[in-house]
């Protein structure tokens, strides 16, 4: 798979810093949180970091598949819903976490389930941003973010194209 024109590769260190920055922003809201719902799979890593930083013990997941081939969004499928106890009070006191909001389609489905929950993502694109309450970094809609769990180390060709100087 080749990189698109606008690629945003994120290292583990950068992602950890950004997820902690998201936790700082949420902590600044000075609210009591009863649980976190991680949108799988991308929300699992930031949810773990945010839970640790905010002292939240109760973690739930919701699984909505949209990227079936890692290149374009397909039909949205809810593969696993949210437990009934967290749906009480329309999600009040719950943080919903994902790595990224792209088109906002995933967030819209979860927001229907939990309209009073607080939605937080590490990264946000313009189309999905209106559905998110707190995020850290905005990237353009045509940028593809490469997360550290999707990458490995590979040889990089020199900028000069291998010319000796």
Swiss-Prot record:
EC number: 2.4.2.-, 2.4.2.22
Subcellular location: Cell inner membrane
GO biological process: GMP salvage; purine ribonucleoside salvage; XMP salvage
Binding site for GMP: 102-106, 144-145
GO cellular component, one term: plasma membrane
MF terms in GO: guanine phosphoribosyltransferase activity; hypoxanthine phosphoribosyltransferase activity; magnesium ion binding; xanthine phosphoribosyltransferase activity
Amino acids binding guanine: 102, 145
Annotated binding of 5-phospho-alpha-D-ribose 1-diphosphate, by residue: 41-42, 98-106
Topology class, membrane: Peripheral membrane protein
Chain sites annotated for binding Mg(2+): 99
UniProt xrefs under Pfam families: Pribosyltran (PF00156)
Assembly: Homotetramer.
Function noted in UniProt: Purine salvage pathway enzyme that catalyzes the transfer of the ribosyl-5-phosphate group from 5-phospho-alpha-D-ribose 1-diphosphate (PRPP) to the N9 position of the 6-oxopurines guanine and xanthine to form the corresponding ribonucleotides GMP (guanosine 5'-monophosphate) and XMP (xanthosine 5'-monophosphate), with the release of PPi. To a lesser extent, also acts on hypoxanthine.
NCBIfam families associated with the record: PRK09177.1
Listed name of the protein: Xanthine-guanine phosphoribosyltransferase
Organism of this sequence: Brucella canis (strain ATCC 23365 / NCTC 10854 / RM-666)
């Amino acid at each position: 798979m080749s990189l698109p024109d606008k690629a945003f590769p994120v290292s583990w260190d950068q992602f950890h810093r950004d997820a902690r920055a998201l936790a700082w922003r949420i902590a600044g809201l000075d609210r009591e949180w009863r649980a976190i719902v991680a949108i799988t799979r991308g929300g699992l890593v930031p949810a773990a970091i945010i839970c640790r930083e905010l002292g939240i013990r109760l973690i739930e997941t919701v699984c909505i598949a949209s990227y079936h081939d890692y290149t374009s969004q397909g039909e949205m499928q809810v593969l696993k819903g949210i437990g009934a106890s967290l749906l009480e009070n329309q999600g009040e006191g719950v943080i919903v976490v994902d790595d990224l909001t792209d088109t906002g389609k995933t967030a819209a489905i979860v927001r229907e389930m939990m309209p009073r929950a607080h939605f937080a993502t590490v990264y946000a694109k313009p189309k999905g941003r209106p559905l998110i309450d707190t995020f850290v970094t905005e990237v353009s809609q045509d940028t593809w973010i490469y997360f550290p769990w999707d990458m490995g180390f590979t040889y990089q060709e020199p900028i000069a194209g291998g010319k000796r100087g």
